[in-house]
Amino acid sequence: MCSLFGLIDFKECLSTHTKNKILNTLARECQVRGTDATGIAYSFNGRLRIYKRPLPARKMKIHIPHGVNVVMGHTRMTTQGNAQINQNNHPFLGHADGSSYAPCQGL
């Protein structure tokens, strides 16, 4: 079992500090459904950024840079593959028609 979380701030109402606080709280709350790995994906300066580690959310500090307004996150409970091998953890980078994206696997 895993969990997804995210944040959208299109009107740019939230400070970067507040966004980071919200994301870390959401990740920790989602940890009950995935304790083996935690990751986020976001767009920054026109590039997709992925930050993930084989750690439970309570041990990982999520920090996004100023100007990021959309973030998708994932906490993982390992059912296949080894969570200690970080390439097995979400989000994954994918490509379609020359565009980069972080696909949702298994939906």
Regions found by a protein language model. Give the residues of each.
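N-terminal glutamine amidotransferase
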Residues: M1-G106
